[in-house]
A protein has these predicted regions:
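Metallo-beta-lactamase
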Residues: 1-145, 181-252, 271-272, 277-278
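Cap/insert and terminal regions of metallo-dependent hydrolase folds
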Residues: 23-24, 39, 43-46, 50, ...
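Catalytic core of the metallo-beta-lactamase
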Residues: 107-113, 209-270, 290, 294
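Divalent metal-coordination and catalytic microenvironments
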Residues: 110, 120, 158, 179, ...
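Catalytic metal-binding/acid-base residues of hydrolase active sites
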Residues: 160, 205, 221, 255, ...
């Protein structure tokens, strides 16, 4: 990672309490980004090279979409789902050890060595505006955002709607937060009001130290894009968060691949592995790994490949 990019992560305590103001001209930011994408081994002709699985399927993509959206009933659970509403008082004291609070889907508040990190924050609808009616939350979570403490860092795995939410980014845009995103993802944040000075873009295996902890951007096997026209224009990633005593792995979205073993070799030992498992598309016959996800047995194998202590 270039020196100019790294410098933006080393903020003083005084700077962390000030409202962000951009010091990097937009043209400079975009020029730096274009340069890094051009020389990144993950990109080719401005797009991320995609090597997802291609498992034979008895149904086409569109057949699965139709049967999944139209044939699976009910889309909402028949029974009440147990949940515990967030209370502001539970975060009154910072946790010096590793503490995780799962907030739904891939959103977690990670507390390590007194630092708070929010992963893939999504609190409203995990879908484009036009599809909100199909993808309402079974348990509303919007108010959780207001109850949480402001994190020092927000980590993004990729730019799909269920991992990168415009309304939540706008909520944090004027807060003293540093955003860590895979290469190319910062353009979305700038559009939603985040200052370029508060965005750090990572290629795979880039790392940074922040107040005694280390964050490493690690590979994943997925895809990216928020429209048909920007498919794979930004990088996707997983993340390793190393504290003084414990190390956490956050997978984001990923199909099963050899990168889990490589991450264990280069970043281990890993204490806690937070791994995705795809929704069970019962009877639909389409392998979720072709969409860049893991079935349950893949998740278990990834856990073993990581040689992690807890899942």
């Amino acid at each position: 990672m270039s020196e100019t990019i790294l410098k933006r992560t080393y903020l003083t305590s005084e700077q962390k309490t000030q409202k962000p103001s951009s010091l990097i001209p937009p043209q400079t930011y975009h020029a730096q980004l274009a340069h890094r994408i051009h020389y990144s081994p993950q990109f080719e002709n401005g797009r991320v090279k995609n090597e997802m699985p291609n498992v034979p399927s008895p149904q086409s993509f569109w057949q699965v979409c139709w049967s999944y959206l139209g044939g699976r009933t009910p889309l909402s659970p028949n029974e009440h789902l147990p949940h515990s509403p967030i209370q502001p008082t539970q975060f009154a004291k910072r946790s010096e050890s590793m503490r995780l609070t799962w907030l739904g889907h891939s959103t977690m508040l990670v507390e390590v060595d007194g630092i708070r990190i929010l992963t893939d924050p999504v609190f409203d609808y995990a879908s484009p505006f036009i599809a909100k009616a199909w993808f309402e939350r079974n348990i509303p979570n919007t108010h959780a955002r207001d109850c949480l403490p402001i994190p020092e860092i927000i980590v993004i795995s990729h730019d799909h709607y269920d991992h990168l939410e415009a309304s939540t980014i706008r909520f944090y845009a004027d807060k003293p937060v540093t955003f860590y995103v895979p290469l190319g993802g910062g353009k979305h944040l700038i559009k939603w009001g985040v200052c370029a000075d508060n965005i750090v873009e990572f290629d795979w295996w880039d790392s940074v130290h922040y107040a005694g902890i280390e964050l490493i951007c690690t590979p994943a096997n997925h895809n990216s894009g928020r429209t048909y026209f920007d498919k794979n224009a930004t990088l996707w990633a997983s993340w390793v968060i190393k504290g003084k005593e414990e190390t956490l792995y956050f997978s984001g979205d990923s199909a099963y691949d050899s990168h889990f073993s490589e991450i264990a070799q280069r970043c281990g030992p890993i204490d806690i592995a937070c791994l995705e498992v795809a929704a069970d598309v019962k009877g639909q016959g389409y392998p979720v790994e072709n969409w860049g996800h893991m079935q349950a047995h893949h998740t278990v194998q990834a856990f073993h490949d990581l040689n992690a202590k807890k899942l």
